[in-house]
């Protein structure tokens, strides 16, 4: 009887000890997980982290930016309409030599447009290129995204598609277009985009025939010149309070391009790209170079791999310069928390316009970057000037 009592007491003590150890292990595991969770929140935030709506557009057209911003302010899930409004505003305001300005015809004197829009939530993309007869090309690009299973439509077929959906056909070429084109023809069609043909394209208008391959000179590629107020592509990026991105671009194409040419504004990842899980990017510059390297896509993927927006922007521009030493252009990068950065090269100065962001009262503020040929300044979400590199965990929008 005594032996049974001792065994029972021993069993009870063992059970109590095991229970105590189990509680201790669970407690330690809880606090360990709590510390890990707190660390993750500190570094990366949570789904409930407050995001301030943000509207960014390339170059310094503040009115178009404000019109897009007014749409974004109406509430969540207005990013699509906001970027479209920005593109249409620039169409109507004749931003630069863009769109309705009529001063960017192809080598036959015809004005064509291209545009694209991308949804960062579903990674859906719609674009048109080399399209005649439709003034608001961004509306047609949006229709490609929403009503078809395709991504890009081009040329007269894109115009036919627009007409089938009820968009009014308009003759875009005007007196200014003809005047600019005639002046270019009288100057021997200089500059143009031909090479390794005869007669020499540096002196003649053509028609051209190919040179035998052994006569190809492969001269150093001269980049397409981009100067303030003389660019032909604009891009808009919108981020709402729910962390949803839309990006869009619209262009009238490189001046005096060969007919049929598709530009960066219509190519996924060249002029625009967005992924809600990571962020978004817009690029501007020599479109043929941008199409070869897809800088907007590269910038987003660089952030996915762990780079901060300022690091991603600078890395992309430096990569472009390694292969195209005369490249002129810029990239603006935004992560999923609304932290933005930009880098440029080959220009005297690059401008982009920002509305929104945490702590900012001034809307449509113009950010300016002084650019170098091989090294770029980096703007890191702040006032104008030179900006230091700051650790990611401290890179919160400053008020």
UniProtKB/Swiss-Prot annotation:
One of its GO terms (cellular component) is lysosome. The keyword ATP-binding does not apply. Gene3D superfamilies: (Glycosyl)asparaginase (3.60.20.30). Residues 1-22 form the signal peptide. Keywords: Disulfide bond, Signal. Disulfide bonds join 90-95, 189-205, 344-371. This is L-asparaginase-like protein GE13669. It comes from Drosophila yakuba (Fruit fly). The lineage of its organism: Eukaryota, Metazoa, Ecdysozoa, Arthropoda, Hexapoda.
């Amino acid at each position: 009887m005594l032996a049974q009592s001792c065994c029972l007491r021993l069993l009870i003590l063992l059970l109590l000890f095991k229970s105590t150890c189990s509680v201790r292990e669970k407690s330690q595991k809880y606090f360990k997980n709590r510390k890990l969770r707190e660390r993750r929140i500190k570094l990366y935030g949570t789904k409930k982290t407050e995001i301030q709506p943000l509207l960014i557009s390339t170059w310094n057209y503040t009115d178009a930016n404000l019109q897009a911003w007014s749409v974004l302010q109406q509430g969540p899930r207005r990013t699509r309409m906001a970027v479209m409004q920005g593109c249409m505003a620039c169409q109507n305001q004749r931003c630069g030599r863009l769109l309705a300005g009529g001063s960017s015809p192809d080598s036959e004197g015809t004005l064509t447009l291209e545009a694209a829009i991308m949804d960062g939530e579903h990674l859906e993309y719609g674009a048109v290129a080399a399209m005649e007869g439709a003034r608001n090309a961004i509306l047609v690009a949006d229709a490609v995204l929403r009503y078809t299973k395709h991504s890009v439509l081009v040329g007269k077929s894109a115009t036919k598609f627009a007409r089938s959906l009820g968009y009014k056909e308009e003759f875009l070429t005007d007196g200014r277009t003809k005047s600019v084109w005639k002046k270019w023809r009288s100057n021997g069609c200089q500059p143009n985009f031909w090479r390794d043909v005869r007669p020499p394209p540096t002196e003649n208008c053509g028609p051209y025939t190919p040179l035998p391959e052994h006569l190809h000179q492969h001269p150093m590629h001269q980049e397409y010149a981009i100067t303030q107020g003389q660019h032909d592509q604009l891009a808009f990026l919108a981020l709402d309070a729910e962390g949803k991105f839309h990006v869009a671009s619209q262009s009238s194409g490189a001046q005096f391009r060969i007919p049929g040419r598709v530009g960066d504004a219509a190519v996924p990842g060249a002029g625009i790209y967005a992924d809600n899980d990571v962020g978004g990017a817009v690029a501007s510059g020599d479109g043929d170079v941008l199409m070869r390297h897809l800088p907007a896509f590269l910038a987003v993927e660089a952030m996915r791999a762990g780079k901060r927006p300022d690091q991603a922007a600078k890395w992309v521009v430096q990569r472009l310069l390694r292969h195209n030493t005369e490249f002129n252009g810029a990239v603006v990068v935004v992560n999923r928390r609304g932290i933005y950065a930009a880098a440029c090269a080959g220009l005297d100065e690059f401008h982009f316009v920002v509305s929104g962001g945490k702590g900012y009262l001034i809307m449509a503020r113009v950010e300016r970057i002084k650019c170098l040929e091989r090294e770029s300044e980096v703007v890191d979400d702040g006032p104008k000037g030179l900006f230091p590199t700051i650790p990611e965990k401290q890179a919160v929008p400053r008020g």
